Regions:
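Cys/His-rich zinc-coordinating "finger" modules and their low-complexity flanking regions
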Residues: 1-201
């Protein structure tokens, strides 16, 4: 019987990693992005991995890029700066890369949920949205979560920023649950954006 509560991982060969839940943000030592919630950790070394970084697949396919075959890499190819095609943030650690097209996806961005719900508003993941983001006010090329009524539009990276800015309200229960006075109250249980036990990088 497989024990998912404790694993061995090539990126941390000296100790096993234990599955834990944290209400405090952590930096993933795999993809180098911030996460919150369930993750694998080594308490001895202060080493953490998102669920999606720990349980990676050698090869994946993504519906937004039907012609691509993404391969898991420990670090970005070449020595040139690269960015994630999902969130548009820099890629500095674990990544899924398509050698044919040159696209890159953080492991957590590759596994983002297609929808987020909080009881009031449902947001759906889109590859391209022409409207500006409800949080930053900018239009962008990154993936976005958008409500069916098109009233709310949030970049994937902005969703993660909102999560980190409000982690105490969301996970500790201090204060109101509303993410922002401008945005809907969305209860993110991301496994980024590691986005996601439902999203957290």
């Amino acid at each position: 019987m497989t024990n998912f509560n404790q694993i061995s991982h090539f990126s941390h060969p000296n100790h096993t990693l234990k599955l834990e839940y944290s209400e405090i943000p952590f930096k993933c030592d795999g993809c180098k992005e911030v996460g919150i919630g369930s993750h694998y950790t080594c308490a001895i070394c202060d080493f953490d991995l998102h669920m999606h970084c720990a349980n990676y697949s050698p090869t994946i396919f993504h519906p937004y890029y039907p012609k691509c075959t993404f391969q898991f890499l420990q670090r970005p190819p070449d020595n040139t700066p690269r960015y994630c095609n999902g969130c548009k943030k820099d890629v500095t650690g674990f990544v899924y890369h398509c050698y044919k097209c040159g696209y890159d996806l953080h492991p957590c961005c590759a596994k983002l949920p297609t929808s987020l719900h909080d009881g009031e508003v449902s947001l759906y993941l889109y590859r391209k949205v022409s409207a500006p983001c409800h949080k930053c006010g900018r239009k962008g090329r990154s993936w976005s979560y958008r409500s069916k009524c098109q009233k709310y539009n949030l970049h994937v990276a902005c969703v993660m920023e909102m999560l980190m800015e409000n982690w105490q309200d969301i996970y500790v229960g201090q204060g109101e649950r509303r993410i922002s006075s401008k945005a809907p109250s969305v209860s993110f249980s991301f496994e980024a954006p590691s986005v996601f036990e439902s999203i957290s990088h």
